[in-house]
Amino acid sequence: MYRWLVRILGTIFRFCDRSVPPARALLKRRRSDSTLFSTVDTDEIPAKRPRLDCFIHQVKNSLYNAASLFGFPFQLTTKPMVTSACNGTRNVAPSGEVFSNSSSCELTGSGSWNNMLKLGNKSPNGISDYPKIRVTVTRDQPRRVLPSFGFTLNSEGCNRRPGGRRHSKGNPESSLMWKPQEQAVTEMISEESGKGLRRPHCTVEEGVQKEEREKYRKLLERLKESGHGNSVCPVTSNYHSSQRSQMDTLKTKGWGEEQNHGVKTTQFVPKQYRLVETRGPLCSLRSEKRCSKGKITDTETMVGIRFENESRRGYQLEPDLSEEVSARLRLGSGSNGLLRRKVSIIETKEKNCSGKERDRRTDDLLELTEDMEKEISNALGHGPQDEILSSAFKLRITRGDIQTLKNYHWLNDEVINFYMNLLVERNKKQGYPALHVFSTFFYPKLKSGGYQAVKRWTKGVNLFEQEIILVPIHRKVHWSLVVIDLRKKCLKYLDSMGQKGHRICEILLQYLQDESKTKRNSDLNLLEWTHHSMKPHEIPQQLNGSDCGMFTCKYADYISRDKPITFTQHQMPLFRKKMVWEILHQQLL
């Protein structure tokens, strides 16, 4: 009797189901009111709906009630929404009621349906309080965690699937979810309260950081070894403490290791640091102040600038150093008391210094002419590294060898051996003490192979007819010098870092004993011979980690003339330039 009524109602229901307005138009119109990081939730329906949508749901509710009244098996895909009395928003039934006709096994076993699991608190209008992250887990794909940039979708954006289930349809403009072909389980994970979204972690960036940390760790280990080892050169120079210079150093722009023409000297060159070089006490104090976190006063900055400018020009600082520093420091009442004490020590040393010694220092600092400066600049400039610039004493000095004389570079064996031969030639011509100099490779050969390994090194030379014998010592990354004075029967070890060389002196003394037996058929009276290491206060000390080779050469220069060693660290830039010119012209200034 009522079959015609059922057919009419079914026709109306199908018509209403097809006339649902499109969801994209609503999304484009409501995009400004959407939350950026809200997720696709099939159970959430926005509070405001178009009037046509409300009319359709009212028709559906009426049909649902009519079907229930007559007892016909009429099923809807969604249950009627209940309007909240407090804020007018619509709340839907729990997700478990949406899939009321499906079992849990069927839900998890299907390869095309998603399981929406929600964590975290929700506000009364059905929107999560915290931002969510979409987690996609597939059987054949690794787990991926991607932030959800989708907008909140309306219920019309969900397509009806067989069996009364709904499948969420993502927004192609905003969703970043990769859809695998295999089964996927989507989880909605709420972040902790108050933390918000974190910056995505980049695997490549992590690898770069690990690589930089590894380089930095190796550099620190090397510097630590050079600072505490017995046979290496401690680095005491002041580097820029800013983070920018540290990163430049870790990126291998500030440090480099080279090998020049197969020689054994490692070129570990700091290329980008600047050092204000003054006398020992003042410079050591400035080093302490740089390491501290306190501020440097303006007067100290002015003094440092003045010292740096004059050291670059190669002027002498000792005669008026105390007056300049004391005058500058008295300008400010807040000067450091420790700095005053250091300056007073310098003043005392300057007063005790004789006029002749000051004259000697002045004679050492001969200014270079413009032509000499140009020639030096050309040699240190760009050009083929294997270009031979000077050849003598069976040695060839290339442009690469000369460029080790740049500021803050380490000298190699070729440069040191060439300069030592220039000292021998100078002593022969100018009537200085008879001098013999061993090669830088002599001591390593003697230490490793004994006397028989170097027996022929003195063929045609009688060492005991000489007055002074110089032996350059290379200890891994540090240069030093041993002076054998046959007139006084003593051996002296000179190290610009204050290290001791008793073992080195003993090896060389034993070599003299073997040489005396071979050449003179007589033993040395070892009781008459003495050896000791020069203490730091007895000879000038380097204030950086790159001038050990220069100090070794200048030790040899002064000692070969029986001249007191009076040079200082701040003269090294000028000495380097002079040495370039001397090697090019094969003549000492």
UniProtKB/Swiss-Prot annotation:
Q: What is this protein called?
A: Sentrin-specific protease 2
Residue ranges annotated as transmembrane are none
- Chief location bin: nucleus
Q: Which UniProt keywords apply?
A: Cytoplasm, Hydrolase, Membrane, mRNA transport, Nuclear pore complex, Nucleus, Phosphoprotein, Protease, Protein transport, Thiol protease, Translocation, Transport, Ubl conjugation, Ubl conjugation pathway, Wnt signaling pathway
Q: What class of enzyme is it?
A: hydrolase
Q: What membrane topology is annotated for this entry?
A: Peripheral membrane protein
Region of interest (Protease), residue spans: 396-560
Question: What post-translational changes are documented for it?
Answer: Polyubiquitinated; which leads to proteasomal degradation.
Highest rank taxon of the organism: Eukaryota
Spell out the InterPro entries in the cross-references: Papain-like_cys_pep_sf, Peptidase_C48_C
Q: What is known of its domains?
A: The N-terminus is necessary and sufficient for nuclear envelope targeting.
Q: Name one Pfam family in it.
A: Peptidase_C48
Motif Nuclear localization signal: where? 28-31, 46-51
Question: In the UniProt record, which is one GO cellular component term?
Answer: PML body
Classification from the root reads: Eukaryota, Metazoa, Chordata, Craniata, Vertebrata
- Organism of provenance: Homo sapiens
Region Disordered: list its residue ranges: 155-176
Which EC number(s) are documented for this chain? 3.4.22.-
